[in-house]
Amino acid sequence: MAGRAATSSAKWAREFLFRRVSSNPLGATRNCSSVPGASSAPKVPHFSKRGRILTGATIGLAIAGGAYVSTADEATFCGWLFNATKVVNPFFALLDAEFAHKLAVSAAARGWVPREKRPDPAILGLEVWGRKFSNPIGLAAGFDKNAEATEGLLGMGFGFVEVGSVTPVPQEGNPKPRIFRLSQEGAIINRCGFNSEGIVVVAKRLGAQHGKRMLAETSATSSSPSDDVKPGGKSGPGILGVNLGKNKTSEDAAADYVQGVHNLSQYADYLVINVSSPNTAGLRMLQGRKQLKDLVKKVQAARDEMQWGDEGPPPLLVKIAPDLSRGELEDIAAVALALHLDGLIISNTTVSRPDAVSNNPVATETGGLSGKPLFALSTNMLRDMYTLTRGKIPLIGCGGVSSGEDAYKKIRAGATLVQLYTGFAYGGPALIPQIKEELVKCLERDGFKSIHEAIGADHR
């Protein structure tokens, strides 16, 4: 195994050191009036002095890894590589927030990130919607908006990855700057406004990736025993969700979501109707009882009228805001139960400013707040929704997760699956195995033998 790991490391180092990368000058804009050609990976922005420092540090780690791997087995080297990213990650804090985000997506798209080779502990595995998740920890929408890096992100050890939000027509989103760090509080404020390359570009990318994943699945199936429920998604290893949004200027929201279903659902293991971003005017009004019911009916009909194989159509979820009243939650729960919605994601970012950020001047920026200060609000709402839906609908807990204990609290409150984004932005790749390891300890500490046993434990 050491020999294979050494070969893999050497190949990775060569690619990193010698691959020529096309550059995209910082601040360059795309033309919204035309659909850009799909590419397998995003352009890397021009490196500033800080960017060159970051690159140099990463190259140094690659060289050190090459020297270390010759004496380590694959699993040991894998752990070392994830831990080594802790050295690189602080350099991202020196960069502009959106530039750092683009750089991270570019790295993941090119495979310049650690790849998890160690199998997940059996205690973390669970079945949802007829799919086997190797672990319940997923990456929320917003990181890989345009499906540029799904393979690299899934390879890092997430149980599932959600891309988007994807709008029908390309749009730039709101003016920059639009992402703001509150580092002391472990939070971010964003007002991106559904910046998206559009469904045509994303569909091309997902189609190309779909073919690769199918090949990987075929290879894995031929070498493993058959099972009634296969691990991974419909088109290969890893579960892929697609989050759908509406265009800012669209007058028919339902038509936008239906267009997303028609173009992207064949590549998705689940679909998400995003009606909760605070950065698109009027979007959150779609969470009202009548509006949501009408919208979900139209989207379900569009999905169900398509031709599906034995696996059937992808599950349909709705992502809701954390700033809802008890009455609004009751209305959403009633719609979800009446229409047999497949799941809810709780929650999106908040427009409120909890006491934890009140002394930070950045908190006055307009936009949705995510990260640690959102944890209590989103978890309390998750707990309420589990009660209102009587535990009959799978819930994805999202908001403020930055540790295994946080993920465990979400699960006990009623989450079947858990997502993170801001925690990943601050913690980097090393946070993924750390959360899974801590989650296992939490489960074993309280005597649970599986994730399923712990779901909703606070209600029993």
UniProtKB/Swiss-Prot annotation:
SUPFAM superfamilies in the record: FMN-linked oxidoreductases
GO biological process, alphabetically ordered: 'de novo' pyrimidine nucleobase biosynthetic process; 'de novo' UMP biosynthetic process; pyrimidine ribonucleotide biosynthetic process
UniProt cofactor(s): FMN
One Pfam family of this chain: DHO_dh
Domain of life (superkingdom): Eukaryota
Endpoints of the signal sequence: none
Cofactor note: Binds 1 FMN per subunit.
pH dependence: Optimum pH is 7.5.
Keyword annotations from UniProtKB, A to Z: Flavoprotein, FMN, Membrane, Mitochondrion, Mitochondrion inner membrane, Oxidoreductase, Pyrimidine biosynthesis, Transit peptide, Transmembrane, Transmembrane helix
Pathway: Pyrimidine metabolism; UMP biosynthesis via de novo pathway; orotate from (S)-dihydroorotate (quinone route): step 1/1
Record-linked PANTHER family: DIHYDROOROTATE DEHYDROGENASE (QUINONE), MITOCHONDRIAL, DIHYDROOROTATE DEHYDROGENASE (QUINONE), MITOCHONDRIAL-RELATED
Name under which the protein is recorded: Dihydroorotate dehydrogenase (quinone), mitochondrial
